[in-house]
């Protein structure tokens, strides 16, 4: 691809392409100067030419191809011919690179040193204004990717109807903690409107998930009877564990009941609890709540 921009004819094509870039803004003299001082290079797909955290300071003009901009490994933007990357280094060369840039496909670039770029911008001062406008636009793009910080961490607690007294105890135990514990019965799922859409919305809003296991049903295996969890609780917990990960999805199981758990939950760290009806119920379940509180506070809000 780079051959198209080499030689006399290629140089003419290169100047014409660069003239249309946003920062150049149809100034052929500026385009010719950047071509003269810059290095024409080809970056194969998948090769990083700007690394986040590096102290390099070159500015790159995309002539052909497509690149991804990644921050902490996450793709935050794509850039195309007509765009440039690395301009922040021209404004403050002492700062490390704020993002990595990786070609999605074979890409042709013009690399211009910070010194040469700054000298060209001094000759054409409106370049600085265009850089400011470009960075303002990109900041607005980045803001769309930032999730508003909730005032409190949100913990979603799910259970069967039979286990609701246990859930009530958990909600009471966490009433004064710096996180919000929400039970499925409290306006999350309405019996007449139980849909996966509602469940998905709760997945997005929650930082942690807690499933209270209870011997609701009996499973007969090889003539043996085992207490087991309701299928809907397993479904809900599986979805939360898939979205939040094992560090943010906790299964509470009764200490004195040998529950038959699905094989998919094998190896999951569980929190045993004791539930004894009566005036001492809170005291019996307090150790399990203390362990759960410790895990939640240690992990904090999700990213």
UniProtKB/Swiss-Prot annotation:
Gene Ontology biological-process entries: defense response to virus
Name of one Pfam family that matches: cNMP_binding
Catalytic activity, EC: 3.2.2.5
Family annotation (PROSITE patterns): CNMP_BINDING_3
Subcellular location as annotated: Cytoplasm
Primary localization: cytoplasm
Annotated catalysed reactions: NAD(+) + H2O = ADP-D-ribose + nicotinamide + H(+)
Alphabetical list of SUPFAM superfamilies matching this protein: cAMP-binding domain-like
Keywords: Antiviral defense, Cytoplasm, Hydrolase, Nucleotide-binding
Coiled coil: none
Residue positions binding a nucleoside 3',5'-cyclic phosphate: 14-138
UniProt GO cellular component terms: cytoplasm
UniProt induction comment: In E.coli strain MG1655 transformed with both genes NAD(+) levels fall dramatically by 10 minutes after infection with phage T7 (at protein level).
An example molecular function term from Gene Ontology annotations: NADP+ nucleosidase activity
Region of interest (TIR-like), ranges: 154-273
Matches recorded under InterPro entries: CAP12/PCTIR_TIR_dom, cNMP-bd_dom, cNMP-bd_dom_sf, RmlC-like_jellyroll
CDD domains in the record: CAP_ED
Database matches in SMART domains: cNMP (SM00100)
Function statement: Pycsar (pyrimidine cyclase system for antiphage resistance) provides immunity against bacteriophage. The pyrimidine cyclase (PycC) synthesizes cyclic nucleotides in response to infection; these serve as specific second messenger signals. The signals activate the adjacent effector, leading to bacterial cell death and abortive phage infection. A clade B Pycsar system. The effector gene of a two-gene Pycsar system. Expression of this and adjacent uridylate cyclase XpPycC (AC P0DV28) confers resistance to bacteriophage T7. When cells expressing the Pycsar system are infected by phage T7 at low multiplicity of infection (0.2 MOI) the culture survivey, at 2.0 MOI bacteria enter growth arrest. The same cells enter growth arrest after exposure to 2.5 mM cUMP but not cCMP; the effector protein responds only to the cUMP usually produced by its cognate NTP cyclase.
Domain remarks in the Swiss-Prot or TrEMBL record: Has an N-terminal cyclic nucleotide-binding domain and a C-terminal Toll/interleukin-1 receptor-like domain (TIR) that probably has the NAD(+) hydrolase activity.
Name listed for the protein in its UniProt record: Pycsar effector protein XpPycTIR
Gene name in the database record: pycTIR
């Amino acid at each position: 691809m780079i051959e198209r921009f080499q030689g006399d004819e290629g140089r003419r094509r290169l100047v014409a392409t660069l003239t249309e870039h946003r920062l150049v803004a149809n100034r052929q003299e500026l385009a010719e100067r950047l071509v003269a001082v810059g290095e024409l290079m080809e970056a194969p797909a998948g090769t990083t030419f700007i690394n986040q955290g590096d102290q390099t300071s070159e500015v790159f003009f995309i002539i052909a191809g497509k690149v991804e901009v990644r921050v902490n490994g996450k793709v935050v933007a794509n850039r195309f011919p007509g765009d440039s990357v690395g301009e922040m280094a021209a404004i403050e060369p002492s700062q490390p690179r704020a993002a990595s840039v990786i070609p999605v496909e074979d890409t042709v670039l013009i690399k211009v040193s910070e010194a040469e770029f700054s000298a060209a911008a001094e000759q054409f001062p409106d370049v600085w204004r265009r850089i400011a406008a470009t960075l303002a636009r990109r900041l607005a793009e980045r803001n769309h990717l930032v999730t508003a910080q909730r005032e409190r961490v949100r913990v979603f607690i799910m259970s069967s109807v039979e286990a609701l007294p246990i859930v009530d105890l958990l909600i009471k135990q966490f009433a004064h903690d710096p996180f919000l514990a929400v039970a499925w019965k409290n306006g999350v799922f309405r019996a007449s409107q139980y849909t996966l859409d509602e469940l998905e919305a709760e997945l997005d809003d929650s930082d942690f998930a807690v499933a209270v296991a209870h011997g609701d049903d009996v499973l007969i295996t090889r003539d043996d009877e085992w207490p087991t969890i309701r299928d809907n609780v397993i479904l809900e917990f599986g979805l939360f564990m898939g979205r939040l990960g094992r560090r943010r999805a906790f299964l509470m199981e009764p200490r004195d009941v040998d529950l038959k758990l699905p094989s998919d939950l094998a190896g999951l760290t569980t929190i045993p609890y004791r539930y004894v009806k009566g005036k001492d119920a809170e005291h019996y379940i307090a150790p399990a709540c203390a362990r759960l509180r410790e895990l939640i506070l240690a992990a904090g809000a999700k990213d």
